[in-house]
Amino acid sequence: MKDRVDRKGVKEIVRILRDELPQLRERYGVRSLGIFGSYLRGEHRRRSDLDVLVELDERRLTLLEFVALENYLSDRIGVKVDLVEKSTLKPAIGRRILEEVRPI
């Protein structure tokens, strides 16, 4: 799977996520997405996952819905996605993620 993403690059990942955003808003209540971590910095390895920050609307997803969203994104992008909900960020690491994140 990693090879597909390497050929696409970050621009292609952003395009895929941007194209999916309207459906994600309707189906899961996604307000915004952003990528951060090793893929964004160009430091990913063969088994690296893609870190995606998600902000959801006021409705709460069940654990199964959250996992379904994570799996859907993994399938669409072609690499394992690690989905992080913005409202659950701890102060110290949250600051670092928010400084690094590339909004979609």
Residue map of PLM features:
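Catalytic core of pol beta-like nucleotidyltransferases
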Residues: M1-S32, R41-R46, D57-I104
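Conserved histidines in hydrophobic membrane contexts and catalytic metal-binding motifs
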Residues: I35
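Catalytic DNA-binding helix-loop module of base-excision-repair DNA glycosylases/AP lyases
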Residues: S38
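Structural signature of the urease/amidohydrolase superfamily beta/alpha-barrel
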Residues: D49-D51
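Short hydrophobic/aromatic beta-strand micro-patches
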Residues: L53-E55
